[in-house]
């Protein structure tokens, strides 16, 4: 994800830190194993230091977290330039299948997602989403407002 922002707030450097208090980007994903609905979704939140907060579950509370080995496989990296910053990470299929069971993903398959920009720090507090969220207070943990993505060849 690329964020057009100069001098992002980036306090946290360790995994599982509350990076949403910094200037952060977030990606949420939800897959359906073999066409059956699963309420479980994944969230990946990162700041411009590459500090990653990631979890999965069916609701905002009682999230499950990834192992140290899984965090290494995500290989979250951040880059900062004059007027923007970017975060890259990868999500190995075997980690998705550990959560959802066999997915047998192929070109043309779909999944649900949303992308966010956030900071909960009062001086720079802001919230934005790719797919609109129709709630009275900002919250990103609402799969009913996720968009649909289609898998294509890279």
Descriptions of predicted regions:
Residues 1-154:
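Structural preference for beta-rich elements and adjacent junctions enriched in aromatics
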